[in-house]
Amino acid sequence: MSNTPIELKGSSFTLSVVHLHEAEPKVIHQALKDKIAQAPTFLKHAPVVLNVSALEDPVNWSAMHKAVSATGLRVIGVSGCKDAQLKAEIEKMGLPILTEGKEKAPRPAPAPQAPAQNTMPVTKTRLIDTPVRSGQRIYAPQCDLIVTSHVSAGAELIADGNIHVYGMMRGRALAGASGDRETQIFCTNLMAELVSIAGEYWLSDQIPAEFYGKAARLQLVENALTVQPLN
């Protein structure tokens, strides 16, 4: 047992970020209700961050917060806020203003070293050989995830690395959960409820029709989710 009553540890979580493009609370409320109806098991009562960077018109923050909360989503913070008055309103309600991560400055080139022995790098992988059923959640921390069987609707795959599904993919796949934007998702039969790479996601209705039910490869290109045939 620890000698101290609390312990602070760093951690990371996969959160949905709702980018607001409209200052009218009623419009946002209805749009969120429609999205939640498309993927209720994923979005119902989900914690979210509201990004307000695209808002150009003044916003009634109290009404906006109520409109979002009325859908069942739990607002845990706000990002992209540059307006001092809006910041004050948000902080008055007890919500934190979150600063989105910036790209790190490039590290200086390392000093020359003696040639290393010719060894192959080892990449960890979590392998699942059985079907992933509705309600199951599989997480592969700091590695890739490979599923050789079917993934049912309502099941969830999460990996800090890439995700490979060599069966029918009907559930949710979240690659790059720790923020790695170079990760990808590979499916032999893409029928997912949701696909996400480093927080950028599509719901099932956003997957291009020509790739639905087909072998596909998803990745981020210029910070946007893209899909192409899996050759």
Swiss-Prot record:
Coiled coil: none
Signal peptide span: none
Entry's Gene Ontology BP terms: cell morphogenesis; division septum assembly; regulation of cell division; regulation of cell septum assembly
This protein's record includes keyword Cell division: yes
Record key words, sorted: Cell cycle, Cell division, Septation
Record-annotated membrane-spanning stretches: none
InterPro entries membership: CAP/MinC_C, MinC, MinC_C_sf, MinC_N, Septum_form_inhib_MinC_C
Listed SUPFAM superfamilies: Cell-division inhibitor MinC, C-terminal domain (SSF63848)
Subunit structure: Interacts with MinD and FtsZ.
Family as reported in the entry's similarity comment: Belongs to the MinC family.
Primary role: Cell division inhibitor that blocks the formation of polar Z ring septums. Rapidly oscillates between the poles of the cell to destabilize FtsZ filaments that have formed before they mature into polar Z rings. Prevents FtsZ polymerization.
HAMAP family per record: MinC
Name of the protein: Septum site-determining protein MinC
Species for this entry: Shigella flexneri
